[in-house]
Every structure is written in C-alpha cells, then in structure tokens.
Amino acid sequence: MCGIIGIVGKEPVADRLIESLKRLEYRGYDSAGVAGVVGGKVERRRAQGKIKALEAVLADEPLTATTGIGHTRWATHGAPNVRNAHPHTAGRVTLVHNGIIENFAELKAELAGMGRTFESDTDTEVIAQLIDVALAKGLAPLDAFKATLDRLTGAYALAVLIQGEADLLLGARRGSPLVVGEGQGEMFLGSDALAVGPFTNRVIYLEEGDYVALDHDSRRIFDASGARVERPVRVVPTSSVMLEKGNYRHFMEKEIHDQPEGCQRTIAAYVDTLTSKAAVPGDIDFATLDRIQIVACGTSYIAGVIGKYLIEQLADLPVDVEIASEFRYRTPALRPGSLVVAMSQSGETADTLAALRYCKAKGMKSAVVVNAQESTMAREVDVVWPIHCGPEIGVASTKAFTAQVSVMIALAIAAAKARGTIDAAEEQRLVKVLLEAPRLIAEAIGLEDAIKEIAADVAKARDVLYLGRGPMSALALEGALKLKEISYIHAEGYAAGELKHGPIALVDDQTPIVILAPYDSYFEKSASNMSEVMARGGQVIFITDTEGVKHAPAGAKVVVTAPASDPLVSTLVMSAPIQLLAYHVAVVKGADVDQPRNLAKSVTVE
C-alpha cells in the first residue's frame, strides 16, 4: 500500500530518499514525506500529492540528516492530507509504516486513557506512541521496539528513528515486505529491492516476523521470538532489480503471495475505511446508467464476468461482458446512455483498445480498469479506475486478476448505493466484508503445502475439468486458463449446470474434476454435480470452505478447505487455491512458469 525507504550513513540522505521514493511511485500514493536525525533531534518534511510537492518543501526547508526515512502513502486510516502523511512522530519516536494495524482502536483508547494525545487519524501513530511509552519506562530503543511489536495485531513494515540516536535505524516486517540493503559505510531499508537498487546490489529479504537494528556499518537481525539470526545476502544486479523475485523461485509464486497486500492496496483506493463507505473515484453517475458494457480479453474478461454477477445482483443494473476480439467485429446494439468499461492489465491490449474506441465513437461514456495508469487506454477514457497492484511480471496473471475483481466489487457496492438498491447500513456491511478479504486471501494461500501434494497427481493428467456455479463458473474458467497457460495440460472450465449437456461424457477415472463450491446459495446444486461425477468414476478435487466441508457428499478424492467468506468476496478467496494448483503442477512438469510458450504479457497486436 505504501513505499518505504530508510538510510543510515555518514553522508546527507535527503536527495537519495527522494530518488528512492520516485522508484516506488508505481505502488500508488497520495502523500509523501521524509524525516531525519539532525543535531540529535528528528525533523520531518511532508506534503500532500506527488513527490514534486515534497521536493518543493525540501527546497524551502532542506534536511541535512545522515540518517533518515521516507514514505509514500495510500490512505487507509485517515484522509489523504499532510496531517495524516508519514512519517509520524510521538515524543522521541518517528516512523513510517506500510500495512494496517487491526487492533489500533483498542490500543488508541488505552493510550488516550494514559493522557496521550494524537495529531493524526492514522493507525500508524499508535505504533509511535507505544514505542515512546516504552522508552519513557526506561527500555532501550531495541527493547522498546520489540515490546511494541508484540502488542500489534495486523500487518506492518516499519522503519523507525529515535531522537538522540543519530546512528540507529530500526525496521520490522509482518505481512508486508521489507528488505535490508548493505552499502559501503551505510545501510538501507526498503519496501523492495527496487527501493534500494540505486544504492546497493546487496539485499537481504527479511522473513515474516523479523526485526532489525541497523547502524552505518552493521546489522542485527532478530526473528519473531527475539533470537538473533542471519539471513542470506543476495547480490541483485542493479540493472535488473525491478525484476527481482526475492526468495521465490518464480515471479508467479511471488505474485500469488503478493495478493493480500495488493488487494489491500486496491481496496483502500475504493472505500473509505473510516466510514465504511464506497468511495469510487471518477465522475460516473451510476443512477442514470441504463447499462454497462464490459470489453476485455483473457483473465481480464473473466474478472469482468465476475463483475457482471455482482453489479447486476447488488445494483439491478444490466451488464454485458464480451470478449473484445469478438465484440469489435460484429454490430452490437449500443446506446449513448450506457457506460463502456475496458479491462486490461497493461492498458495496451489491441482488441480491447479497438472495442473501447468503437464504443466511444457511438457516444458512450468510457472507463478503464487498468494497472498501467500511463497506458493508451488510460489516456483515452473519461475515467480511470487503477487496480494499484504494482508491476506484474509473470505472464499468467494472478495479483492483477484479484485486484481487478476487487475493483469490480467496489464498483458494485457504489452502484448499488447510487441506485438505491442498498441502504447505508448494508453499504457499510459490504465494505467491511471487502476490507476483510486480504486477510482471508492470506489464509487461503496458507493451503499451499496441501495443494503441492495434489499437484503431483494432477501433473500426470492429460485433461482437467473445472466446474462451478454462479460466480464460481467464471472462476472455473480462470482455473482452467491458468492451468493450460503454464502447465500445457488441456483444461476446460464449465458452468456446472452444463455438465449433463456434454462435458459429462469426458468424465472417467483418469480425468481430475476440480469443483469450486463455497457454502453459498449454489452449494446444494454443486454438491449434486459432484455426486454425478463421482458416480461415473470421476476423480474429484473439491475446493470448498470451512462450512461447505461439513455438508459435502463423501467420496471426493481430495478436499481443499478454504476459509469461509461472504459470497461478495468468495471469488477472491477461492482464487488462491486454483492459482497455486496451476503453479505447482507447472513446477512438477518443469514448465517455464513465468514465460510460458507462445504467450506475452501485453498483447498489443490483434
């Protein structure tokens, strides 16, 4: 959600903090700030808006520190303004933070009861206050830091300065990435290797729960228990630091694991976390629309189909979804009162761009759901809805897909509220459900070891079928697409109700049948399809949730139990198992996971 940089050394750091923050702009942000230890005191410079606004502040008020931290912020708790911009200070402590502290309200109330006052609306300031309280009790900086970490619930990456400690930089991570960079007579902290890439090619990827104390020429790393540990130093060519996989074997694996943070960043851009209301950017009056026309290709098309289910269900607004390469070569019946929504990770997909231009020529208002905000589509539409998931390197889309679906969910809520099909209470409930999705996705990713075992058998198959009902029928298409893209196994996805209309002829004891069935209104019908498949010797891989597993018919070869979720976000939660299955099947088969044959990341030709 945010970008972090920290430097401890012997030379002024302000210019390099800014340089690093510019490299982190791809992550998205609405404010920026830096801080440094000057003459034993910590000084801050902050600005709302782009980094150039922060540079203007620094031009008027230079920062001469040799130890400093920097941050680009996407608002989660608190409005996007200077008061809520990082770094945040409490007493002797100044810090920057990426993540969400789930128990901040409880901690803030406790601190307020101690007479502590707050200058911002953020959850981050609570962390600074807790560290300062511990320091006031006489704890050493590192001990005060650890005592605070033990009290936090949620996700964080932190970089911390302490007043009077000009040669100390503290860092920690849980749920959000953080790296250490080793330089000559200086050390660095960063959100990723890209952040420290201009200054060093020696990078340490902190593991979950690690915290670290840096001075200009040494590092001390501790695990979550407080034990001193060593982590491997990786030499990362600075020319290719953007393409760094960290400790993962493939970009696809990394990007699957990036999804909790990625979706959190996406969702934060489309809802107000303080009021639990939808806050979709752009000038679109959903109340006056008579129809939405979605055009897309590949995985983006499937995300659009999921969007159709949700928008029609919640907002009673008709939605058509078409494959752009088909749409553009027929004569669709279009109306000026409709909205065309193009969906494309790159914003350059040729067929989608052509379909978008066709609709615009018919007088339709236009929007794009896109990752690349400077792309052709983004420049040509009336409204841009960015997905904010950061660079996606693997050809088979994972985090961009779930980010697109996250945007579609937010759009569905906003449209429903605008059209009066839900009231304020239901809007708040739905937004809270959406805000829970990143945590549930992380839990689903935790099924990876079990899915690895399944992959060994699936890798032997010649064909695989995926079945689902409702939005899960779209996810069945996505599961099949992922598997065929990277493992080269023939796979097909079907609406489970179509089973008896043809696909059941393919069922035998050699063909794995993946059935996606969370415990929702479609579950009983999906369970019936499962029984039909098993009666014919089909090898069922049943992907359900903690409620569905209680009601599933016996006989499945394998049952994968994802966390239970509201139907609003079940496609997000169930995406992780199908992505991991495709990934590990491809690994077993020795396929080129990140660059599968014949495929390109951005399809810019017809």
Swiss-Prot record:
<dbReference type="InterPro" id="IPR001347">
    <property type="entry name" value="SIS_dom"/>
</dbReference>
<feature type="domain" description="Glutamine amidotransferase type-2">
    <location>
        <begin position="2"/>
        <end position="217"/>
    </location>
</feature>
<dbReference type="GO" id="GO:0097367">
    <property type="term" value="F:carbohydrate derivative binding"/>
</dbReference>
<dbReference type="GO" id="GO:0005829">
    <property type="term" value="C:cytosol"/>
</dbReference>
<dbReference type="GO" id="GO:0006487">
    <property type="term" value="P:protein N-linked glycosylation"/>
</dbReference>
<feature type="active site" description="For Fru-6P isomerization activity">
    <location>
        <position position="601"/>
    </location>
</feature>
<dbReference type="Pfam" id="PF13522">
    <property type="entry name" value="GATase_6"/>
</dbReference>
<dbReference type="InterPro" id="IPR047084">
    <property type="entry name" value="GFAT_N"/>
</dbReference>
<dbReference type="InterPro" id="IPR005855">
    <property type="entry name" value="GFAT"/>
</dbReference>
<comment type="function">
    <text>Catalyzes the first step in hexosamine metabolism, converting fructose-6P into glucosamine-6P using glutamine as a nitrogen source.</text>
</comment>
<dbReference type="InterPro" id="IPR046348">
    <property type="entry name" value="SIS_dom_sf"/>
</dbReference>
<keyword id="KW-0677">Repeat</keyword>
<dbReference type="GO" id="GO:0006002">
    <property type="term" value="P:fructose 6-phosphate metabolic process"/>
</dbReference>
<protein>
    <recommendedName>
        <fullName>Glutamine--fructose-6-phosphate aminotransferase [isomerizing]</fullName>
        <ecNumber>2.6.1.16</ecNumber>
    </recommendedName>
</protein>
<feature type="domain" description="SIS 1">
    <location>
        <begin position="280"/>
        <end position="421"/>
    </location>
</feature>
<keyword id="KW-0032">Aminotransferase</keyword>
<feature type="active site" description="Nucleophile; for GATase activity">
    <location>
        <position position="2"/>
    </location>
</feature>
<dbReference type="InterPro" id="IPR029055">
    <property type="entry name" value="Ntn_hydrolases_N"/>
</dbReference>
<comment type="subunit">
    <text>Homodimer.</text>
</comment>
<dbReference type="GO" id="GO:0006047">
    <property type="term" value="P:UDP-N-acetylglucosamine metabolic process"/>
</dbReference>
<dbReference type="InterPro" id="IPR017932">
    <property type="entry name" value="GATase_2_dom"/>
</dbReference>
<keyword id="KW-0808">Transferase</keyword>
<keyword id="KW-0963">Cytoplasm</keyword>
<dbReference type="InterPro" id="IPR035490">
    <property type="entry name" value="GlmS/FrlB_SIS"/>
</dbReference>
<keyword id="KW-0315">Glutamine amidotransferase</keyword>
<dbReference type="GO" id="GO:0004360">
    <property type="term" value="F:glutamine-fructose-6-phosphate transaminase (isomerizing) activity"/>
</dbReference>
<feature type="domain" description="SIS 2">
    <location>
        <begin position="454"/>
        <end position="596"/>
    </location>
</feature>
<dbReference type="Pfam" id="PF01380">
    <property type="entry name" value="SIS"/>
</dbReference>
<dbReference type="InterPro" id="IPR035466">
    <property type="entry name" value="GlmS/AgaS_SIS"/>
</dbReference>
<dbReference type="GO" id="GO:0005975">
    <property type="term" value="P:carbohydrate metabolic process"/>
</dbReference>
